[in-house]
């Protein structure tokens, strides 16, 4: 099972993005969406500066077209475990959300697809299986 993070999802939608073609190839391999990454992608694409801002209905359709599977998400007990891991691995600030995405992929047994070199450090600290999409 493979799951993209927000960096792959945004690049997969944005034809003007330098990583668009690689992201589309990755997404066409059959992916599962992580709930947080789906919501974050919606947020990013609907708030880009003009002329790149996307209408909410278009982002919704894009996310729906990627997969018909249920989103991957942590259960309540796993959120408690996540905060334990955050403290144990000294994950702070915005990297906390990278950890949420990575921890969700790991809990689901999915390899995480990313274009975000900065997030790779967090993913690796949590021992998440990662594939860089280039």
Curated annotation (Swiss-Prot):
GO MF terms held by the record: magnesium ion binding; RNA nuclease activity
Positions of disulphide bridges: none
Catalytic activity, EC: 3.1.-.-
Every PINc domain range: 3-126
Keyword line: Hydrolase, Magnesium, Metal-binding, Nuclease, Toxin-antitoxin system
Cofactor dependence: Mg(2+)
SUPFAM superfamilies: PIN domain-like
Residues at which Mg(2+) binds: 5, 98
Oligomer and partners: Physically interacts with non-cognate antitoxin VapB27 and cognate antitoxin VapB40.
Function noted in UniProt: Toxic component of a type II toxin-antitoxin (TA) system. An RNase. Its cognate antitoxin is VapB40.
Similarity annotation: Belongs to the PINc/VapC protein family.
Annotated protein name in UniProt: Ribonuclease VapC40
Organism per entry: Mycobacterium tuberculosis (strain ATCC 25618 / H37Rv)
Record lineage: Bacteria, Bacillati, Actinomycetota, Actinomycetes, Mycobacteriales
């Amino acid at each position: 099972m493979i799951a993209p993070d927000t960096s792959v999802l945004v690049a997969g939608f944005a034809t003007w993005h330098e990583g668009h073609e690689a992201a589309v190839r990755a997404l066409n391999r059959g992916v599962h969406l992580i709930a947080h990454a789906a919501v974050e992608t919606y947020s990013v694409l609907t708030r880009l500066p003009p002329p790149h801002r996307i209408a909410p209905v278009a982002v919704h359709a894009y996310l729906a077209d990627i997969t018909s599977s249920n989103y991957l998400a942590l259960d309540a007990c796993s959120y408690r475990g996540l905060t334990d891991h955050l403290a144990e691995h000294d994950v702070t600030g915005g990297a906390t959300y990278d950890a949420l995405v990575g921890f969700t992929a790991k809990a689901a047994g999915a390899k995480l697809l990313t274009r975000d070199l900065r997030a790779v450090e967090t993913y690796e600290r949590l021992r998440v299986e990662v594939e860089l999409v280039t």
